[in-house]
Amino acid sequence: MSSGHKTQPQPSAGPGDRVFTKAEPLRPPAATYTISARSKHPDAPVFGYLRNQYGNVRLAEIDSLFGFVERSELYGGRAFRQRELSDRDVEQLNNAGIGVRLPLSNHFVERSEYEKNLPFLQKYHRPGNSVIVTNDDLARWVRQDFPFYRIDASVIKNIKTHKKIDEALELYDSVVMPMHINEDLDFLEKIEAKDKITLFANAGCALTCPSKLCYISFSRFNKVGQGEIQCSRSMKDRYVMGMVDFPLQVFIDLGFHRFK
């Protein structure tokens, strides 16, 4: 601006002249997901892992990650080989409002084992984190001593009747349904507590497995870190479908919003 000229003050813009609008709260997502940290190396940054493996899922849609932290004989569902989520991962996830789900789905839990794992459970005991449980005694002990954990009934419990769902929800906060239930829309529609149900977004070999021997063998393996891992594939014929992605909008329209 050159010298010698006086400028007149401009009237301030009124609300109607502004190009921005008042910020509104973000709408909650139509669906949220609990995501597997399987095969994640503990040294890999967790948000880099999410970007590379689940880049199509917005962070606002991620409820939690489930995976191994330090070793525990309470683990089940698959064999513990090494840690997947580091302490830094857990801290960063929790700071971002994303929970950590500990897969404590071992079939066999003694009281002495539970007491041995009290420091482990205390370490991750904070609102937003959860435990995945198969053994009802373990669920009761955790409920009594660690009220901040959400307790999820594992898919391994194979809860597949409306009566069993209602009974499970007397102890558990939510129930993970077997994969094949996704194909029975009439059954799903009749579930009353849909907000406490987790359905599978995709499915692998367990969808058509006739016996699921592996889960018991994983429970035994994780007690000592060794042993035979069994699979029924060589014992019983099955139709192998590979990885199956379910059409989630069908389930959302029925009133389900939590997916794994």
Predicted stretch roles:
Residues 2, 9-12, 18:
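Intrinsically disordered, low-complexity segments enriched in serine/proline and basic residues
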Residues 17-164, 171-260:
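Active-site pocket-lining/capping segments in soluble small-molecule metabolic enzymes
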Residues 7-9, 13, 23-26:
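Selective for proline/serine-rich intrinsically disordered segments
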